[in-house]
UniProtKB/Swiss-Prot annotation:
Its cofactor is pyridoxal 5'-phosphate. Its EC number is 2.6.1.42. The keyword Amino-acid biosynthesis applies. This is Branched-chain-amino-acid transaminase 1. Pathway: Amino-acid biosynthesis; L-isoleucine biosynthesis; L-isoleucine from 2-oxobutanoate: step 4/4; Amino-acid biosynthesis; L-leucine biosynthesis; L-leucine from 3-methyl-2-oxobutanoate: step 4/4; Amino-acid biosynthesis; L-valine biosynthesis; L-valine from pyruvate: step 4/4. GO terms for molecular function: L-isoleucine-2-oxoglutarate transaminase activity; L-leucine-2-oxoglutarate transaminase activity; L-valine-2-oxoglutarate transaminase activity. Belongs to the class-IV pyridoxal-phosphate-dependent aminotransferase family. Transaminates branched-chain amino acids and ketoglutarate. Involved in the final step of the methionine regeneration pathway, where ketomethiobutyrate (KMTB) is converted to methionine via a transamination. The amino donor preference is isoleucine, leucine, valine, phenylalanine, and tyrosine. The keyword Amino-acid biosynthesis applies. Transmembrane segments: none annotated. It catalyses: L-leucine + 2-oxoglutarate = 4-methyl-2-oxopentanoate + L-glutamate; L-isoleucine + 2-oxoglutarate = (S)-3-methyl-2-oxopentanoate + L-glutamate; L-valine + 2-oxoglutarate = 3-methyl-2-oxobutanoate + L-glutamate. Keywords: Amino-acid biosynthesis, Aminotransferase, Branched-chain amino acid biosynthesis, Pyridoxal phosphate, Transferase. InterPro entries: Aminotrans_IV, Aminotrans_IV_CS, Aminotransferase-like, B_amino_transII, BCAT-like_C, BCAT-like_N, BCAT_family.
Length: 356
């Protein structure tokens, strides 16, 4: 145990929710991790404390100028009762990249991993064992200086909270989703903050997501901000197309989030001898490939669902049914392989899991 991390014992333990009705982000565990930052002092007072509301000044910078970044990863319960984390080091590195872009102080990556591990270990009983469930881990940093001046805050709070979550697919069966291609609103611009996991990016996506939902679609496929034709990402996922037996995914251009599941999928697909092209691809190319019968699969990758097959794309009322509208072979193999690694059923070729 890192003795630098203090612990305060709770006097009240919550009743654990019914694992069959967890949903996403509705329940929270007994403890949270907290650490503070002041300019001239640095990060200090790391502690695990009872989960509780925060007290913040109404003029705290986070409320006015959006200095807020976060991460999302999961802890999984194996069949033999162990608890595994999936590539937590990559999430922590990405958190620091987000901090840098938002002019926020970097975190000690070893300390963050230790804090995360200690917190999950303390809350092991909250990691559900039912199929498709997991313990969602949300690290985040917010600006706390009480000031209305437009400048980087001089104080911050870093926290980690935990939430038991159910299967993204409800019954844990892969289901193809319907995607609306958005060419009015944009998610990010070159030179902006698209590669950072910052709160404002998600706020900016909500109106388009609402529009897509009202039209009967599940997710939004974002295009580039300049020409509005080059594919970027889908909602909270990166996107892949299988064209002529090759996997094609948009290159990381600075306006696309560098997904941990995306990177894992690329490594696995290549290890299976299937070519992966990371390049600019327009929505017109996707539709043309479909017309030629060469587009056999589309899928998204992300922490929430791991792999999400896409059965339909729509832009300006023009619909493309992907493959036969069902789950493709590569989507299924990827989902099964990554989830088997996360659940400790197979070790996998890359040593991606960390036991708590």
């Amino acid at each position: 145990m890192n003795k630098l991390i203090e612990r305060e014992k709770t006097v009240y333990y919550k009743e654990k929710p019914d694992p069959s009705s967890l949903g996403f982000g509705q329940y929270f565990t007994d403890y949270m991790f907290v650490m503070d930052y002041e300019e001239g002092i640095g990060w200090h007072h790391p502690r695990i404390a009872p989960y509780a509301p925060l007290t913040l000044d109404p003029s705290s910078s986070v409320f006015h100028y959006g200095q807020a970044v976060f991460e999302g990863l999961k802890a999984y319960r194996t069949d033999d009762g162990r608890v595994l984390l999936f590539r937590p080091d990559q999430n922590i590195k990405r958190l620091n990249r987000s901090c840098e872009r938002m002019s926020m102080p970097p975190l000690d990556e070893e300390l963050v991993l230790e804090a995360l591990t200690q917190l999950v270990e303390l809350e092991k009983d909250w990691v559900p064992k039912e199929k498709g469930t997991s313990l969602y881990i949300r690290p985040f940093v917010i600006a706390t200086e009480p000031s209305l001046g437009v400048k980087a805050s001089r104080s911050y709070t870093f926290m980690i909270v935990l939430s038991p979550v159910g299967s993204y697919y409800g019954d844990d069966q892969l289901k193809p989703v319907r995607i609306y291609v958005e060419d009015e609103y944009v998610r990010a611009v070159n030179g902006g903050v698209g590669f950072a996991k910052t709160a404002g990016n998600y706020a900016a996506s909500l109106q388009a997501q609402r529009k897509a939902n009202e039209l009967g679609y599940d997710q939004v496929l974002w295009l580039d901000a300049i020409e509005k034709k080059y594919v970027e990402e889908v909602g909270s996922m990166n996107i892949f197309f299988v064209i002529n037996g090759e996997a094609v995914t948009p290159a990381l251009s600075g306006s696309i989030l560098s997904g941990v599941t995306r990177a894992s999928a690329i490594e696995l697909i290549r290890s299976w001898g299937i070519p992966v092209r990371e390049e600019r691809i327009s929505i017109d190319e996707v539709y043309a490939a479909s017309a030629r019968g060469e587009l056999t699969e589309v899928f998204g990758t992300g922490t929430a669902a791991v792999v999400t097959p896409v059965g339909e794309l729509n832009i300006h009322g023009k619909t493309v049914i992907v493959g036969d509208g069902q789950i493709g072979d590569l989507s299924k193999k990827l989902y099964e392989t990554i989830t088997d690694i996360q659940l400790g059923k197979v070790k996998g070729p890359f040593n991606w899991t960390v036991e708590v």
